[in-house]
């Protein structure tokens, strides 16, 4: 397979994980409502596995929470979606260049890839050349007997490391944010969460 790995930008609307998955799985950047329903149904159907200790909240609370379009997805949701689609999901973290692979114990024979900057997920695609239309993107890759996707992995890692060199990520432990409601400044994800819980304000902007 020849070409280059490109980052396909997904809108920053609190549903980027779901819409990035929609793009790499179905070439559809508007799958968030449907995929949130899929996740809520999976969690509700297995209360033994998806208990309060696992979810960080009661099963019923989580199901209502994940259906809220303002709530973000993460590892739990990626794991469920890997099983839903029957494909591995590789999520590359720009800051560390680490790859978290979901569904890897299931022996799925295909893989898709996402890239994560600390706050936001975008899709990764194999494009025939720089500037090619998204219609030509390849987003689903066969997994070989060695459980790799061959040269695609190297191309993806090169892109991730290039983004890392450009500091195209957010250090969520130390970034500085300003509340869009009351303009107060906070440092790091922990302080932002505490401020949101105390005030109900959830609109933050990063500033340097």
From Swiss-Prot:
InterPro entries per record: OTU_dom, Papain-like_cys_pep_sf
One Pfam family cited in the UniProt record for this chain: zf-C2H2_OTU1_C
Assigned GO CC terms: nucleus
GO terms of molecular function: cysteine-type deubiquitinase activity
Keywords tagged on the record: Hydrolase, Protease, Thiol protease, Ubl conjugation pathway
Active-site positions on this chain: 13, 16 (nucleophile), 120, 201
UniProt keyword Membrane, yes or no: no
Effect ascribed to mutating residue 179 to S: Normal ubiquitin (UB) binding. Abolished'Lys-48'- and 'Lys-63'-linked UB chains
OTU domain location: 5-127
Result after altering residue 195 to R: Normal ubiquitin (UB) binding. Abolished'Lys-48'- and 'Lys-63'-linked UB chains
EC number(s) given by UniProt: 3.4.19.12
Catalytic activity: Thiol-dependent hydrolysis of ester, thioester, amide, peptide and isopeptide bonds formed by the C-terminal Gly of ubiquitin (a 76-residue protein attached to proteins as an intracellular targeting signal)
Biological processes annotated in GO: proteolysis
Entry superkingdom: Eukaryota
Keyword Zinc appears in the UniProt entry: no
Described purpose of this protein according to its UniProt entry: Hydrolase that can remove conjugated ubiquitin from proteins in vitro and may therefore play an important regulatory role at the level of protein turnover by preventing degradation. Cysteine protease with a preference for 'Lys-63' and 'Lys-48' -linked ubiquitin (UB) tetramers as substrates.
Family affiliation: Belongs to the peptidase C85 family.
Protein name per the record: OVARIAN TUMOR DOMAIN-containing deubiquitinating enzyme 2
């Amino acid at each position: 397979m020849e070409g280059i790995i490109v980052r396909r930008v997904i809108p920053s609307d609190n549903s980027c994980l779901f819409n990035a998955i929609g793009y790499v799985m179905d070439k559809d950047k508007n799958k968030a409502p449907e995929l949130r329903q899929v996740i809520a149904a999976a969690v509700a159907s297995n209360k033994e596995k998806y208990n309060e200790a696992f979810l960080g909240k009661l099963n019923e609370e989580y199901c209502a929470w994940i259906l809220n379009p303002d709530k973000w997805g993460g590892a739990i949701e990626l794991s469920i979606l890997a099983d839903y689609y029957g494909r591995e999901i590789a999520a590359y973290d720009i800051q560390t260049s680490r790859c978290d692979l979901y569904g890897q114990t299931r022996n799925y024979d295909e893989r898709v890839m996402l890239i994560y900057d600390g706050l936001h997920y975008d899709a990764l695609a194999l494009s025939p050349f720089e500037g090619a239309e998204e219609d030509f993107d390849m987003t689903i890759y066969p997994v070989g007997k060695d459980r790799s996707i061959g040269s695609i992995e190297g191309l993806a890692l090169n892109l991730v490391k290039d983004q890392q060199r450009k500091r195209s990520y957010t250090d969520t432990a130390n970034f500085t944010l300003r509340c869009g409601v009351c303009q107060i400044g906070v440092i790091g994800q922990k302080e932002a969460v505490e401020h949101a819980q105390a005030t109900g304000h959830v609109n933050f902007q990063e500033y340097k």
